[in-house]
Amino acid sequence: MNKTEFIAFMTDHGHNHKHASHKTLTKAEAEKALNLVLDSVISAIKSHHNINITGFGSFEIHHRKAREGRNPKTGAKMKIDAYNQPTFRAGRKMKEACN
């Protein structure tokens, strides 16, 4: 599901919600809310802050050291620079919902 499909899913009045008090959003409201959350996560990770949302999961940044690798086509050695890798680890509720 891409971002546009997810926004449509968020605004779908026909799918069943667990809570009767769930207020549906317009597409514009859903897009604005999603963009705000995504921009905030990116900004926090960029500032080297970990984000833990109980039950949902955690966003973290892992530093990868520089290392030597190989070009898979030629087999030639090459240097891979150090970089920061953003990661997501699913929380218990997320894992349980998938199984």
From Swiss-Prot:
InterPro entries: Hist_DNA-bd, Histone-like_DNA-bd_CS, IHF-like_DNA-bd_dom_sf
GO molecular function: DNA binding; structural constituent of chromatin
Subunit structure: Homodimer.
Disordered: annotated segments: 67-86
Pfam families per the UniProt record, alphabetical: Bac_DNA_binding
Name used for this protein in its record: DNA-binding protein HU
Keywords carried by this UniProt record: DNA condensation, DNA-binding
Record function comment: Histone-like DNA-binding protein which is capable of wrapping DNA to stabilize it, and thus to prevent its denaturation under extreme environmental conditions.
Protein species of origin: Rickettsia conorii (strain ATCC VR-613 / Malish 7)
